[in-house]
Amino acid sequence: MSNTTFRPFTGSSRTVVEGEQAGAQDDMSLLQSLFSDKSREEFAKECKLGMYTNLSSNNRLNYIDLVPKNTGSRALNLFKSEYEKGHIPSSGVLSIPRVLVFLVRTTTVTESGSVTIRLVDLISASSVEILEPVDGTQEATIPISSLPAIVCFSPSYDCPMQMIGNRHRCFGLVTQLDGVISSGSTVVMSHAYWSANFRSKPNNYKQYAPMYKYVEPFDRLKRLSRKQLKNYVRGITNQSVNHGYLLGKPLLKTDEQDPEMIVLEEESLTPTDSNGVGKDKIAVTAKSVAGLPTASLSINRR
């Protein structure tokens, strides 16, 4: 074979067919679900791309493969055939340089508990009956209240393409919730990104502990410009709704003024004159003010 490196995909989170996940309450139940006849049929289908993993207290542990099983099977058969012919030096390895996991909180900031992410090698399940982190270090635990965050993993070796029981050996991601109060509902959503290569020559790499960064939540009130505020007011102001027949009021004529009209003074966003009065004013109905960020606005009656 002239080219002994294959790039079958560069992807993002893959879950089992129809967006399902392998979930369980403890390690033994998780392993049984992974290696059962049912899971063998489900994991035989290509995993979907771009799927978020929902984490809830119902399924405290979740697992996803980093390679769709059909893709891994085809690569294994191809490399094995070429190896037996003497065209390549090995039966192939899976190389994943790094895995980037984005975690988002989907519950109140007062939620207790934490989320743990582990990069695992399925070989650990056959030897110690538990999915241990790769290198004993590729694991990170983050309080749910501190999310959003990004975690990066990097294994120090390439994974041989071989069979472990009735499954292909593969790198995978385990997510685990601990100390969560909410019952049944999704409290965290995770999304992973990585690239995977199949190679004929294995290698070792410098070992790193997982790196993670907390992401500053977007401040959707503070970062509104004056133009955005005006557009927001125009977008929520609908005369046919505020004054329409559904509310028992006729539509206003163009030369009439509604007695309920108020003025919004953009104090922090608009230059003021010597008397401290805002130069730019936006007239909207009292009913359409709901939802506006009031921290930088004052409301005065005419």
UniProtKB/Swiss-Prot annotation:
Key word Transport present: yes
Cell compartments where the protein resides: Host cell junction, Host plasmodesma
Family affiliation: Belongs to the bromovirus movement protein family.
GO CC, alphabetical: host cell plasmodesma
The protein's role, per its UniProt record: Transports viral genome to neighboring plant cells directly through plasmosdesmata, without any budding. The movement protein allows efficient cell to cell propagation, by bypassing the host cell wall barrier. Acts by forming a tubular structure at the host plasmodesmata, enlarging it enough to allow free passage of virion capsids.
GO process annotations (BP): transport of virus in host, cell to cell
UniProtKB keywords: Host cell junction, Transport, Viral movement protein
UniProt protein name: Movement protein
